[in-house]
Structure formats: structure tokens, C-alpha cells
Amino acid sequence: MCIRDRSSNPEVILGRVYLENKVGHAAQRYFNQNNSNRQSMGATRGLVDEYLCIDGRPIYTGGNEGNYEQNPNFLGYGKWTELENRDPRLTQTICRPGEHVTIYQGGVVDKEKNGIKYPDLNYNASGSTVTGYRVIKHWMGDIVEEDRTTQGIQAAIEFRYGELLLMYAEAKYELNGTLSQADVDLTINALRERAGYDFNKYPTARLIVGNEPTDPRLDKIYAEKLDYKISPLLREIRRERRVEMAIENRRYEDLMRWKAGKLLTVPLRGMKFTTVQDLYDGTHTTKPEIAQQVELDKTVFVDEEGFLICYPKSPYQNTIKGTLPWEDYRYYWPIPKEELVMNPNLIQNAGWENR
């Protein structure tokens, strides 16, 4: 993701390159500001929870809500433990505590001066993240690229081989109602091995058709939000797509294709919040980060389980206590009003008539 010339990455099938002082962009500049400014971007707990553990099994392997059986490899919802023993792609997507996530502050690009900000939870202040899960995927940490401002030349990957494998797996399953082990090895297991799973140490990390892992947490969400049932194998195909393509602008279109828009109504949550004493600076010590005094029910808000509620006071009124609205008419786009005026025989798509 962090390349200037797509030709240096054999996985890239279709990409865009930019020319310094001719055609550029501000992606790194905005990414850095959005990752550390009042735009407050961050990954959701829903995404983080979907990453498997290093043994290829979910964080919960049995039981029911309120009494789930926890995977021994899952070390719990602690800032210093949650990302450990997980699918290697998790820490290729989300910052570990102590990693640099910004080198821009007050118009000055200086990695050493600005230091490390993680998680910096104040959802409505400069230098913050709304979820606590800072994104590292796509981030170059390159002072030169930052200083180019609107003339950045980081290449844009539009289509890559990893996505092709995921498309192949999904299409074959939808066509045949199943997937052969050979196809799973060619696609999902190939992606897992490339990511860093150790199949020799953890044989269960290799997906086996007919022996898919149980995931009571995710199955419960699907049962509540979807009006159709999916098999364990299809669940794993969709999981693989979500984690492999995370933060690559594919999720919304995937949900529309799967007729799974109601998954957008799963409450948006962030990391588990404990106390201010858990927030440290970049020294990897117990030194408190004085600059980020976080007050419960004032600068951050949590649910009954202690997880951060995202955008609890959204000025845009898009959320209700961290929950997005959804109506099925949104599976279709509205016909533009000017088209309706030009052709009175056109009928607006249902649900959009008065919007």
C-alpha cells in the first residue's frame, strides 16, 4: 500500500501513479490529519473482532452471549493485549500501542518532536481518534511525502491479485453452493499463508471445508441482521474478504452485493475504555500522557460493557448512540431529479420519492 511506483509490486493488477509537480494528491497529508485530528477516524471494534486468532479460530469459540467460551489465544480487550496472537493482518491494519501514527502537528512535519499519539480517545478534539483503533494501513510515515502537501506521489492500488482470489472464491461458492478444498487452498489459505499464518504450528489456521471454526458471536449478528442464512463456509469467505480488504474502500459495496445492509446497524463501538492511567505516551513506560486527559461521559462515552460509543453526539445526526440507520430502499440509488424532469415516464425508485 505504501509505494510510489506500482510496478515495484507484482500483486498490483490495476493502479494509478502520480508525477511530481505535474499530477499529485494530498492522500498522505489528509490521512495523517484524519488519523490525528478532529475528523477522528478509526477502525471499529466490529472489524477488529472479526480477525481470527493465530490458530485460525475466532476470539470466541463456543457458548452464548454473556457466556462465550474464549479462545485461549485471545488475551482479552486490553490495549496492550488485544492485538496480540491474532491474524497477522490485524497489526498490518491497526497500530500497536507505541507505534508512530502521526508526524504532522500544527503544520510541522517532525516525527521526533510530535512523537506518538495512541490511542488519544477524545472524540471531538484535535489530535484524537473516535475508536482508539488507529489505522496504520496505507500510512507511509514519510516526511518527504507529507511535505509535498497536494503533490503527493504515493501510488493508488485500484485492483490487486489478493482481491482477485477473493472474488474467485466468492463467485464459485455462489455458483455452486460450496467450494472445493482445492479452491480454498488456492484462495483463502494462500492469502492466510502470505499474511504470515504458521500452518505447521497451528494446523487449524488452514481453513478446511466441512470443518470450519465455530463463531457464536458472528453467527448471532448474522442471524439478527440478515433475512437469510449463510453457511459456515460462506461466513469464512466473507470474513476473509473483510480482513484482507480492510480500509480499502470495499466494505459498503460488499454489503450491498450480499443484501446485508442491516449489518450497518450493528452499534459502532471502539476499544474498551478503562481509566486515564491506561493512556501512556510513546515511552513504553507507565508515564501518563498528560495532554490527553479523558473524562468519562464528557469527552468519551461508553456502553454498558465499557466499549467506546462512536460519535455519540454527532453534529450531523447520522448516528443514534453510535448506531447508523438503515432502510432497504437504500439498496438502490435514486434516479436524479433532472432525469425525472426530462422524462416524465420515469418512476422514482421506491423509498426515494420524497427525499
Feature annotation, model-predicted:
Residues I3-Y30, T61-R355:
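Acidic/polar-rich alpha-helix caps and helix-coil junctions
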Residues Q28-R45, G107-V109:
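C-terminal/domain-terminus segments
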